[in-house]
Design a protein with these regions (language model features):
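Bacterial N-terminal signal peptides
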Residues: 8-18
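Bacterial N-terminal signal peptides that target proteins for export
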Residues: 1-9
Length: 180
């Protein structure tokens, strides 16, 4: 009997040495934007860096193409995304519970990890369009951005500040950044 126990102990030890210890993997998903925009490759670059060392730290990263900043923030808040790329102004509004996030209240659990690049509002018009001031946009064709994007949310702030309705534009296109 003692021989059998000794043999089982040696066999168990040999098997445990030969089998790697499997660390529990943690999966992280980063919400980005449209696949042709800037946010998607940004998320992809982050995931490539994380995944290079995944055997060491046990974290596996993937990206998800989304509607953009506002969508990402709302989805993080709902617990459906781990991280997301977002314009800093919309992160600020979400954290404070202002503007588009007023009804939801402050999202104090939201944190910034780093800044990718500044995103100022830029309005371009042809020289012969007659647009010299923001008020000259009324009655014009304009890309207001896709729903869920920071571009769209920023346009809605401008629209409200100007006292306009969507019908005040000749055409309100909902194009993604890469389509403009």
């Amino acid at each position: 009997m003692q021989k059998v126990i000794k043999w089982l102990a040696v066999t168990a030890l040999a098997l445990s040495i030969g089998v790697p210890v499997w660390a529990e993997q943690t999966f992280v998903t980063i919400g980005t934007g449209g696949v042709t925009g800037v946010y998607y490759p940004t998320g992809g670059a982050i995931c490539r860096l994380v995944n290079k060392k995944r055997k060491e730290h046990g974290i596996r990263c993937s990206t998800e193409s989304t509607g953009g900043s506002v969508y990402n923030i709302n989805t993080i808040r709902a617990g459906e995304l781990d991280m997301g790329v977002a314009q800093s102004d919309w992160q600020y509004h979400s954290y404070r519970g202002t503007s588009k996030f007023k009804d939801q209240g402050p999202f104090k659990g939201l944190r910034a990890i780093f800044s990718v690049h500044p995103e100022p509002v830029t309005i371009l018009a042809r020289r012969d369009s007659g647009v010299r001031h923001i008020s000259d946009l009324k009655g014009k064709r304009l890309n207001i951005g896709n729903p869920g994007s920071g571009t769209r949310a920023t346009w809605e702030v401008i629209e409200e500040a100007m006292g306009w309705a969507r019908s005040d534009l000749k055409l309100a296109a909902e194009l993604r950044s890469a389509e403009t």
